[in-house]
């Protein structure tokens, strides 16, 4: 970066941006009352106007993580998300169009609208690993493996409503037309459970 190791406090240009050198022990920002004021002023100077929120929101591919703080210094409003989500914290993997995250709560979601190649059948969430996936013109087959004496709940994205579902175990299924996802539930087997879906 070309900045001397013992450079004095200040702003140094690097590439298309800047580097701020702060010669202060980071623990002082949290140990002293209002110790963060200096750091916040520097951040505001670097980025312009700061926007304070009571939540953290992070997207990584189709995964969404959100947490709302209950330290109502900023706001005690819940975070509300709209779209088509699978709630990954709920073992029943429900589909939701509106997700409300209250102060003191967290959410871990799968954003169905963010799926690439949404017309290709694929398992979006499951309590198993899928092997030997085979995608046909009007079919999708795979083997689901997971430890014995555990229940499998999975949400599968399909191009159309299934006409036939074959599972090598007793199962329950439910179609969600808005998200084009099939909810499948059955008991796991370590040697695998074969699933075949046709539409």
Predicted segments, located by residue:
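A conserved amphipathic helix/loop scaffold
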Residues: 1-137, 154
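Hydrophobic, well-ordered secondary-structure elements that form the walls
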Residues: 66, 142, 165
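Short proline/glycine-enriched turn/loop motifs at strand-loop junctions of beta-rich domains
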Residues: 71-74, 80-83, 147-150, 157-163, ...
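Solvent-exposed beta-strand/loop surfaces of large extracellular or lumenal domains
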Residues: 82-98, 166-185
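Beta-strand-rich interaction surfaces with strong enrichment in secreted/lumenal proteins
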Residues: 96-99, 131, 142-144, 183-187
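Proteolytic processing hotspots in large secreted/extracellular or virion-associated proteins
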Residues: 135-152
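Surface-exposed interaction regions enriched in Ser/Thr/Asp/Glu
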Residues: 187-199
